[in-house]
Every structure is written in structure tokens, then in C-alpha cells.
């Protein structure tokens, strides 16, 4: 399965909306993914242009969450949220929590933002889906700019880019340097959820997480008793594709010490 962004065809599909076509489905009222297609992954080391806050206190969360109050915080982060399937599930499972999806690809993040807007308008429930939002950013560079020390309760890394080539393993989103940043924004007792269909990447994640002094892996019975665990397999678009193709899932959950 070729996933390294630099090995992919750089050409993306034409955005139908730009050609005057309506990207919104007349049946579901939701944006159609075919108008937002982009290559599978993006180079995290490339010099993308991002606006980002100088410090967490500068983030205007109210612009993303209309109902958030000054004493409330974003506590769940889906890193590399893709097309937002799992992010939507988080919003439904935890209506009292504010969850953010972070995605580096511009068309994909546009899709998630449009999807959330459509869900908010479509839902008849007051406040529905106003607890989820998406940011286009590079989480490998700017995570501490958004979150204060110990702010997050849960972080999710679902089907990240494997960067198969050995020379590019340093680009993997789980590495020793970044694990220290994740530990900084995670509260003690907070959880890191990882899922991949690539066994080599799974072994890499487990090795690096277990070698880091600020994490411990949950026992299998703890993983299976977590109500989020069943959702990790199919809620994301990538996870659903693995299920359709009868592929393997490799799960590991870690606790911040």
C-alpha cells in the first residue's frame, strides 16, 4: 500500500465546486467527498503556509465552538483527522466535551469544516455538533501553540502516514521528540490512542511509547473495556476501508504518567 506523500501522484482531482458544481448532496445535505479529494498524505516537513497562534491564550476557540464558555477547554484532539468520521463520532459520544480535529491537507480540512457546518444546520437538536471543530495546521510543529500544559485528556493517532522508507521514519508522527511535546499537553492520566493497519508502524509506535518515561501501555483488558475502542475500527474513513478490505488493525493505548 503506497502511502508516502512524496511517492504519490502530485495531481489532485479538480474541485467541482470551483467549476460551478454544487458539492453538497441533495439527498443527505452533506458535502460530497469527491469534490474534496487530495493525495493520501502531505509532507509534514514541507514549508506549508499556516496561520498559528503565538501561545494557547491567543486561540479564539469561540470562533470554532459557538457555545464554548471562557472556563471551558478543548480536551480531545484527533491528530490527522482525515475526513472527520471519527471526530463526528467523538462529538456524538461525548456531547459535554470539546473535540478538535487537526488536519494538514487543505482540501480535506475544508471538507471536514463544511461537513461540521452542514451537520449543525441539519440537526434538529440545539447545540448538536457544536462541540467539534477542525483546524488546518501541522500538529507536528504547532501543537504547543494551541494547547496549554496538561490541557488534553485524550489524543488520537488513527492510521497515520507510515513513511515506509527508513530515511523518512523521522517524519513519523510518533517519535521521541514529539512524544515529549504530547506529554506536555496531556494531563496526567490522559490517554493516547493509536491504530494502524501497518504492523511495522505499530511495532515502532509501541517501542517508542514504551521507551519514553512518561507513558505506559494499557493492559489488553483495559483497552477492550474502553467504550471508545470499538469506534476506532470503523468510525474513521480509513478504518472502514481496512474493514472492507479485510485488513488487520493494530491497536495500542497508552496512559500519560
Swiss-Prot record:
InterPro entries: SAM-dependent_MTases_sf (IPR029063), Trm8_euk (IPR025763), tRNA_(Gua-N-7)_MeTrfase_Trmb (IPR003358). Residues 1-25 are annotated as: Disordered. One of its GO terms (cellular component) is nucleus. Keywords: Methyltransferase, Nucleus, RNA-binding, S-adenosyl-L-methionine, Transferase, tRNA processing, tRNA-binding. It catalyses: guanosine(46) in tRNA + S-adenosyl-L-methionine = N(7)-methylguanosine(46) in tRNA + S-adenosyl-L-homocysteine. S-adenosyl-L-methionine binds at residues 80, 103-104, 138-139, 158, 236-238. Residues 1-12 have a biased composition (Acidic residues). The keyword Acetylation does not apply. GO terms for molecular function: tRNA (guanine(46)-N7)-methyltransferase activity; tRNA binding. Its EC number is 2.1.1.33. The keyword DNA damage does not apply. It is found in: Nucleus. Signal peptide: none annotated. PROSITE patterns: SAM_MT_TRMB. Gene3D superfamilies: Vaccinia Virus protein VP39 (3.40.50.150). It is an enzyme of class 2 (transferase). Pfam families: Methyltransf_4. The active site is at 161. Pathway: tRNA modification; N(7)-methylguanine-tRNA biosynthesis. Belongs to the class I-like SAM-binding methyltransferase superfamily. TrmB family. Catalyzes the formation of N(7)-methylguanine at position 46 (m7G46) in tRNA. This is tRNA (guanine-N(7)-)-methyltransferase. The lineage of its organism: Eukaryota, Metazoa, Ecdysozoa, Arthropoda, Hexapoda.
Amino acid at each position: 500500500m503506497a502511502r508516502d506523500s512524496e511517492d504519490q501522484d502530485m495531481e489532485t482531482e479538480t474541485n467541482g465546486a470551483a467549476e460551478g458544481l454544487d458539492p453538497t448532496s441533495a439527498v443527505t445535505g452533506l458535502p460530497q467527498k469527491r469534490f474534496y479529494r487530495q493525495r493520501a498524505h502531505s509532507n509534514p516537513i514541507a514549508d506549508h503556509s499556516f496561520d498559528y497562534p503565538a501561545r494557547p491564550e491567543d486561540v479564539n476557540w469561540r470562533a470554532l465552538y459557538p457555545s464554548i464558555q471562557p472556563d471551558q477547554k478543548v480536551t480531545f484532539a484527533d491528530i490527522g483527522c482525515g475526513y472527520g468520521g471519527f471526530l463526528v463520532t467523538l462529538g456524538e459520544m461525548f456531547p459535554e466535551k470539546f473535540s478538535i480535529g487537526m488536519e494538514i491537507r487543505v482540501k480535506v480540512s475544508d471538507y471536514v469544516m463544511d461537513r461540521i457546518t452542514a451537520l449543525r444546520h441539519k440537526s434538529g437538536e440545539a447545540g448538536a455538533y457544536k462541540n467539534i471543530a477542525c483546524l488546518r495546521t501541522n500538529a507536528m510543529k504547532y501543537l504547543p501553540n494551541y494547547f496549554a500544559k496538561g490541557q488534553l485528556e485524550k489524543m488520537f493517532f488513527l492510521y497515520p502516514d507510515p513513511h515506509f522508507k527508513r530515511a523518512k521514519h523521522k517524519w513519523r508522527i510518533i517519535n521521541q521528540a514529539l512524544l515529549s511535546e504530547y506529554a506536555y499537553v496531556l494531563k496526567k492520566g490522559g490517554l493516547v490512542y493509536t491504530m494502524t493497519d501497518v504492523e511495522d508502524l505499530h511495532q515502532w509506535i509501541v517501542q517508542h511509547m514504551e521507551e519514553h518515561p512518561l507513558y505506559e501501555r494499557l493492559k489488553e483488558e483495559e483497552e477492550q473495556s474502553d467504550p471508545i475502542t470499538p469506534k476506532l475500527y470503523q468510525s474513521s474513513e480509513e478504518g472502514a476501508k481496512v474493514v472492507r478490505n479485510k485488513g488487520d488493525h493494530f491497536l495500542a493505548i497508552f496512559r500519560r504518567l
